[in-house]
Each structure stands twice: as C-alpha cells, then as structure tokens.
UniProtKB/Swiss-Prot annotation:
Taxonomic lineage: Bacteria, Bacillati, Cyanobacteriota, Cyanophyceae, Synechococcales
Protein name according to UniProt: Cell division protein SepF
Start and end residues of each stretch annotated as Disordered: 151-191
Ranges of compositional bias, category Polar residues: 166-178
Subunit structure: Homodimer. Interacts with FtsZ.
Species assigned in the record: Prochlorococcus marinus (strain MIT 9215)
C-alpha cells in the first residue's frame, strides 16, 4: 500500500490497519489458559510472595564479575631491556601498556640515542600516568601506574638524564647561590 492510498483510507475511515496486524502471532486460548492456571496456582503464589527481590539481584550480579586483563594480584612482571638502537624503544612502550615494569639499561647505546630513548620512554610513561626513576648510570626504571615505586636513597633521582663521558661536571662549592655572570671577566665556576 502506498502512502497516498493509506492517507485516503484514513480520511475515508476504512480499516487500513487490519492488514498490518493480521501478520502478528497471537496467543491461542490454550496458552492463555495455561498462563491463568499458573498465576492462580497457590504454590506459585506463595513462592512469588515469599521471594526476596534482592536475592535475585545478588545472584545475577555475582555472575557478571569480569577480571581486568593484565592485572594479577599474585605477581608482577618486570622486563629488562638492553637496547642497542632507538628502534627497540616501541617494545618498551608496549611492555608498559601491558602493565609491566621496564628496566632500561642504556650502556650499549650511543649517548645521544640513549638520551632520545629516555625522553621517548619517559613521554610514554607520563602518558599512562606511570613512574620513572633513575637507578644508576644509564640505567632507568619505568613503571606503570599500578606499580608503586619507592626509593631508599634520601636524594631524589634525576628523571631522564643520561650522563655522557665528555660532559664536564661543575661544582659550585659551598656557596649555593651562583654569582652573576655579567660584570665578571672571569667565570670561576667554569674554569
């Protein structure tokens, strides 16, 4: 039936909707009698009256508990990586995404690439709200947010700094405030 013919049928008062409802499956009289008998049965009335609706909810709720993947209370996994190039850094990021702690030993890398690698992994660690800690010279610990990292040393470890062999180390001595560089012909801190 087209839209125009249906509109004409509505205006004329014809029985236009009977065609649509004839296709539906109605319950037979036997089925209706079975439903009435079930409702009127004294055994079923008492069972439904004595039932606690909260018991049904608790039974269903316990079956819907799903564990989170990657989290286990029994053990945590630590991945030790000794990369030789920056190309191996996505593996460390993937390990962090899988909630594994990563110890990165960068002693076999070129210092410039090692700095780049630490910056890359530190960015990934920051993105997942993780923690980073310098363990030793060119050795770093990166942990996901589900791992608590505590340090036994009283001083804070400097995050994401790779010392190089050719970098001179400067000391300001006992004076903690540096002297201004302007007006002085000789910089005592750099000589």
């Amino acid at each position: 039936m087209s839209l125009i013919s249906r509109l004409k049928a509505v205006v004329a008062g014809d029985e236009y909707l009977d065609d649509d409802f004839d296709e539906l499956d109605y319950a037979s009289e036997d089925e209706l009698n079975d439903i009435d008998n079930f409702k009127n049965s004294p055994r079923n009335k008492n069972a439904l009256a004595n039932a606690n609706p909260f018991d049904f909810m608790n039974n269903n709720r316990s079956s819907k508990v799903v564990g989170m993947p990657g989290i286990s209370n029994s053990s945590s996994e630590v991945s030790l990586m000794e990369p030789r190039s920056f190309d191996e850094m996505p593996q460390a990021i993937q390990a962090l995404r899988e909630r594994k702690t990563v110890i990165l030993n960068l002693t076999m890398m070129d210092p410039d690439q090692a700095q780049r690698a630490v910056d890359f992994i530190a960015g990934g660690t920051y993105a997942i709200d993780g923690h980073q800690e310098r363990v030793g010279e060119s050795i770093f610990l990166f942990a996901p947010s589900c791992v608590n990292v505590t340090s036994s040393s009283p001083e804070e470890a400097s995050p994401s700094s790779v010392p190089t062999e050719n970098t001179p180390q400067y000391s300001l001595g006992k004076n903690t405030t540096p002297e201004p560089a302007w007006g002085n012909s000789k910089l005592s801190a750099y000589s």
